[in-house]
Amino acid sequence: MFNSFGNIFRLTSFGESHGPGVGGVIDGFPAGIKIDMDFVQQELNRRRPGQSLLTTSRKEPDTVEFLSGIFEGKSTGCPIGFVVWNKNQHSNDYENIKNLFRPSHADYTYMQKYGIRDYRGGGRSSARETISRVVAGALAKLALKQLGISVTAYTSQVGPVKLDKDYKSYNLDLIETNDVRCPDPEKAKEMAELIWKIKGEGDTIGGVVSCVIKGCPIGLGQPVFGKLHAALGNAMLSINAVKGFSYGQGFDSMELKGSEQNDVFYNNNGRVETKSNYSGGIQGGISNGQDIYFRVAFKPVATILMEQHTVNINGTDTTMKAKGRHDACVLPRAVPIVEAMAAMTILDYYLIDRTTQL
């Protein structure tokens, strides 16, 4: 299995949903960065289960314990090891389905590939693995902050309820004022009501997380196989339940003519800028200094509390009904995960760019 992400800034994660804990080892993190432990924990709290009535009721403190690489509050340049211990596993919730393949889960593919699987909460395929990403992403954010780079994500769509304007039209400071993490209070209320309704039916629903990266310098990314948008796409598509990635105008640009879609350059007091940003801040695979923005599509959570047809490990047709504690919609908790993967990617490519010229 490929359990590492990144080139210079590199995370190797470990752990399963119902094992003793999850964690990681970070290589390539610059020395001398002040580590704000409260901020790191705050980022984990944004991802933590049980934070609202809209999320899974699994209660986990998700307190991170750093094992190495930090001394007197600063990074040392050595590998940073960390772990978050699992405290609230209910493995018995999975006894009734341990010999069944849950529809649209990784159960069947894991069994076929490895000949063995951890059926308790999906094991390694569980979104609980993303804890390690959020910790690494929090550290990446701290480094990027020193460079004047910020990463902000928000829920822009839940099912049919979606925002009809781009990020510039909203006050992004409102994202954390509601459980859905949407910058539009009225739309957030509609989204929450829809999630609550779907949850009451024992079903699930998907949506879209949008993300904007501000302050990114010109020149990040490679022209052929290391395009920045490809790296961001790879990062986002590695997140559980993600089904699509679109940057800039994405598929909407297909409806425009070149004369409408081109980002025209102009001189803004000695600085070259573009009058529009249909490219999403990336041209030729390289950042152009404008805001980078993209959208990430999440499918409905596969575990539903309704009877479904499936097969058992012997291939016999049967039915199953899941039980336990599950999210009806991953979007609110996915926001910090999207931010984390984006921050890790940008920091990695910033460090790569420093090797371009002597």
From Swiss-Prot:
It comes from Phocaeicola vulgatus (strain ATCC 8482 / DSM 1447 / JCM 5826 / CCUG 4940 / NBRC 14291 / NCTC 11154). It catalyses: 5-O-(1-carboxyvinyl)-3-phosphoshikimate = chorismate + phosphate. This reaction introduces a second double bond into the aromatic ring system. Reduced FMN (FMNH(2)). This is Chorismate synthase. Its cofactor is FMNH2. One of its GO terms (cellular component) is cytosol. SUPFAM superfamilies: Chorismate synthase, AroC. The keyword Flavoprotein applies. Keywords: Amino-acid biosynthesis, Aromatic amino acid biosynthesis, FAD, Flavoprotein, FMN, Lyase, NADP. The gene is aroC. InterPro entries: Chorismate_synth, Chorismate_synth_AroC_sf, Chorismate_synthase_CS. Pathway: Metabolic intermediate biosynthesis; chorismate biosynthesis; chorismate from D-erythrose 4-phosphate and phosphoenolpyruvate: step 7/7. Disulfide bonds: none annotated. GO terms for biological process: amino acid biosynthetic process; aromatic amino acid family biosynthetic process; chorismate biosynthetic process. GO terms for molecular function: chorismate synthase activity; FMN binding. The keyword Repressor does not apply. Gene3D superfamilies: Chorismate synthase AroC. NCBIfam families: aroC, PRK05382.1. HAMAP family: Chorismate_synth. Its EC number is 4.2.3.5. Homotetramer. NADP(+) binds at R47.
